[in-house]
Amino acid sequence: MSLRIKIDKLRQLVTYFSEFSEEVSINIDVKSNVLYIFATLGGSINIWTIVPLNSNVFYNGVENTVFNLPVLKVKNCLCSFHNDAVVSITADHDNNTVTLSSHYTVSIDCNNEQIPHSTGTSISLGIDQKKSYIFNFHKYEEKCCGRTVFHLDMLLGFIKCISQYQYLNICFDDKKLLLKTPGTRDTFVRSYSMTEWSPTLQNYSFKIAIFSLNKLRGFKKRVLVFESKIVMDTEGNILGLLFRDRIGTYKVNVFMAFQD
């Protein structure tokens, strides 16, 4: 069983995710006809995208599968393949490897006769396939209780000024989300008006690690403004902030968990 993907799509995905992590987890859901690409960045941060299985991304198996892919290694070896190649990705869980292979065929003139000429490439990369990530992707789509917009440069500039702190307090007031430094001396406050608002938010306050917010620096090359929403589960528990980005036509989700 292997995953076959056109090299331009593969390059697009591994280039994006390698900005944040050396490896990702690939979860193929045959019934839903999609694959999930997931990475955990530390600091209670998860990043994932959902890719439909189609002619550009094809899986020939009949059962769901999960494997790990070393995106940084893959990115660095894609120059070995033809620019029009379709790359097959096969995981070997017993030997902790993943293999990329492709056969590219062209017609060449040989004594005035067109004959096929094939070039084969196979690259085996080591990665721990015993690790597994349990992540409920649908949990963060269940319920939204607020939305706002973050200007990335301004947010990063704000947290640069408060690097001596470990976390920010998050609270809500008068249709605004407030980021506040702890304590009463040298207090820094940043407020964001909310495009969607629930009055019950005023009953809550949380913490978020500055370490987590600093992870957003990886988006600085491609994102000016982040749309974000505050998500809760079906039981009404507020979970954290969900940011949105794109890789071409694919939506990317970045989730930061709140701390009580």
Curated annotation (Swiss-Prot):
Induction (free text): Expressed in the intermediate phase of the viral replicative cycle.
Keyword terms of this UniProt record: Activator, Transcription, Transcription regulation
Pfam families xrefs: Pox_TAP
Known role: Associates with RNA polymerase to initiate transcription from late gene promoters.
Keyword match Transcription: yes
Disulfide bonds: none
Annotated source species: Fowlpox virus (strain NVSL) (FPV)
Protein name, UniProt field: Late transcription factor 1
UniProt record similarity statement: Belongs to the chordopoxvirinae VLTF-1 family.
Subunit annotation: Interacts with the late transcription factors VLTF-2 and VLTF-3. Interacts with the late transcription elongation factor H5/VLTF-4. Interacts with itself.
Superkingdom assignment: Viruses
GO biological processes: regulation of DNA-templated transcription
The UniProt record lists the keyword Transmembrane helix: no
